[in-house]
Design a protein with these regions (language model features):
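Eukaryotic phosphoinositide-binding membrane-targeting regions
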Residues: 1-186
Length: 186
């Protein structure tokens, strides 16, 4: 087992029972890879005291999807919806309400597989980040990082330590999150 496998989990395809849907080869418009040059932009998104109040409600009302690919790069995007009947036009983002789903028909959500580099289907671990100021009473970690991805975060073998290691990577870039680990059922 490699050092990366021990730290972040093994690289594997999406959980078989969920698979990857045909529309999930389309990358989200909001897709960004965590790196030195993108970290300031990502930090500004997660700052609830933004100078531009026009955009303040957006981060606190949506889920941010994240995934670690096989080369240990972390990719993030809003959970976007597309209309496959309109040339895959982005029509919005899903609100963070757990019951929120795109309307039936030609509207589809872009899930975790869409965050991977083109042609890749394997990842180490994935989840969501959402605004939860009550999770950390100190008020320093207003956002919560989870492993809630049915295809990449809740597979057998995914551990709390893997999610803690992901938190550590974000912290290296000045991004501090509380954490909620969901134990895989398989």
């Amino acid at each position: 087992m490699s050092k990366e496998d021990e730290r972040f989990g093994k690289c594997a395809v999406a959980a078989e029972h969920l698979g990857i849907y045909p529309h999930e080869i389309i990358p989200p418009k909001s897709l960004v890879t965590l790196a030195d040059d993108t970290a300031p932009l990502i930090r500004s998104f997660f700052n609830p005291a933004q100078e531009q109040t026009l955009f303040t409600p957006i981060p606190i009302s949506v889920h941010v999807l994240w995934i670690m690919d096989c080369s240990c790069k972390i990719h993030l995007a809003l959970e976007e919806m597309i209309d496959i009947s309109r040339d895959n036009a982005v029509i919005g983002v899903l609100p963070k309400a757990s019951s929120a789903q795109p309307p039936r028909g030609s509207f589809k959500k872009l899930g975790h597989p869409t965050l991977l580099p083109k042609g890749e289907a394997e990842a180490r671990i994935a989840g969501e980040i959402y605004f939860d100021p009550e999770k950390d009473p100190s008020g320093k970690r207003l956002w919560c990082l989870t492993n809630e991805s049915g295809r990449y975060g809740l597979r057998a073998g995914q551990s709390r330590e893997h999610l803690e290691a992901i938190c550590g990577i974000f912290e290296e870039f000045g991004l501090y999150f509380s954490m909620r680990y969901v134990k895989p059922t398989a």
